Amino acid sequence: MTIHKIGNLFFVLFCLMSCNSSSEKVEMKNLNGIWDKKTQQKFDFKIDDAQNPKNIIIVVRNNNDYPYSNIRFIVNATDAQTKKKSVDTLNYVLAKPNGEWIGKGFGDTKETLFQYKLNYKFPKNGDYSIGIIQAMRADQLKGIEDIGLKIETVKP
């Protein structure tokens, strides 16, 4: 194979791997390595196929400046039409007991996916929002680069 063909092959593979299916939505918020305790990260989204169950996943990208092995969140979910709210307090593990990050990634940044709600059926089509607040002791939580929300349709 010539170098030109190999380059084209890598380009096609990269494009295929970087595409999200239409049944998946991902939104990330950049925190620049510091997450203020008073700052809620809000994710607004529309559900057009409430009949299909969804997995709601919280995405965390941390670096080696993160001083803890776990992370705690307060999650506020709101139905935009009815204004009905639910609040969850969550605790997730970011590191093994030996201090090794469990997330995947190259270099200092690791990405970890945390299951928030699995096989969740939204009550109806419409607009929703999920707000995430860090609930750690530190007012300025260092080492969190990005926080995100991934919503995927459950495959039958």
Regions found by a protein language model. Give the residues of each.
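Post-signal peptide N-terminal segment of mature Sec-exported envelope proteins
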Residues: 27-48
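Noncatalytic modules at the cell exterior or secretory-pathway interfaces
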Residues: 51-58, 120-136
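Bacterial signal peptide processing site
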Residues: 20-23
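Post-signal-peptide N-terminal segment of Sec-exported extracytoplasmic proteins
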Residues: 41-68
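Short coil-to-beta strand junction motifs in C2/discoidin
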Residues: 67-73, 143-146
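An anionic, turn-rich surface loop/hairpin at beta-sheet edges
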Residues: 90-121
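Short acidic/polar inter-strand loop motif in beta-rich domains
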Residues: 63-65, 111-112, 121, 134-142
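C-terminal motif of bacterial Sec signal peptides marking the signal peptidase cleavage site
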Residues: 16-18
